[in-house]
Amino acid sequence: MPIDRERILSLFGEIQKALSILKEFQKEKKEKIIGDLKVLGSVKYYFIVVMEGCIDICHHILSREQWGVPESYADGFVLLGEKKIIPIKLAQNLANMAKFRNLLVHLYWKVDDERLY
């Protein structure tokens, strides 16, 4: 099956919305972000939204191209890099972000909130 361009564009739109919100938070001082649980929770949520969109795009491409099922979200980005769909450096950055996303979602009590800023 061909790649669903509309689905990819829709996911990119959601990623862009979440990134624009994160950029607004970036203007705030670190103390405000880290010190306010509501703000910190919003930052974490929008980071997860960005990563979920990236992961969905990644898995859609891997599935449609029949390149197999990666063992982890991070491995999916590495595979896209190996297939030259995205630059290797971007693949590595996205893989690291996917690992951080997993930490946020599954081991949230271990997250160093300073890393979010």
Regions found by a protein language model. Name each.
Residues 1-117:
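Solvent-exposed interaction patches of small proteins and small membrane subunits
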